């Protein structure tokens, strides 16, 4: 693709704004649109990404301890490295806190970031600290991209595979908003997202053609992967793996579990397109649970079926979409 966006983005106001910025930048930018930027340095191929976590948008203090806030913010950034199968190496931390914030809170935020980095083999190598109206955590992550997998590359006939079980973060969010403490498994999925770096390297070794981490919901991020690859897909929604806690809450809300799971964001599980002849081995041998959920097709657009009958999927999360 010509212009600064190498990898086309899916629909949404947030991504319209990114496209508009890229158009204004023109030749002053390059390589935009994927989970990471790729740079050559000292003979190595590096993957670099940056992720913000903002108080009142991504978390509130009523829900999480400071160390959990820090851990979650860093894990979200590091997940971008997993999305391209890069090995985490380094993290730079930008942190803003209110002027009257306690030293203990700042220390716990920093400890959470350090723990998330250490859990996947990255080292904190620098950062910045500032005053602000609320907590903002900005993590820049760097990894070795020896087995680079991007969002683009899915081909007709490929099978779509998702790691883990979905719905936990949305279940936790809705329970907190209702004034209830979430079930432990759902809370853990929200507060301490699991690292999927080993799974990402396994998937890359099994000829993964395209990959993305699920941050805006399975439905939304699948649309991004399809747009990047210039293909379409059918998602077999009854195959979507659902966390039991999420399925229970969906039943209380009179929503189908697959629908609940498909719109749950900030999962940080992996969605990958693999050749059909690799799909069975991927599911059987992946170091974390993995499930085939659909098939890539030549006809563009996302279609969803439940046991063969067409169904509608919710849109993915959009920071500037309609509430």
What are these regions (language model features)?
Residues 2-20, 64, 98-123, 130-137, ...:
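Glycine-/charge-enriched secondary-structure boundary and capping motifs
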Residues 3, 43, 53, 88-174:
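Glycine-rich anion-binding loops of enzyme active sites
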Residues 1-65, 93, 116:
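Extreme N-terminal cap/leader segments of soluble proteins
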Residues 170-187:
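Short, compositionally biased
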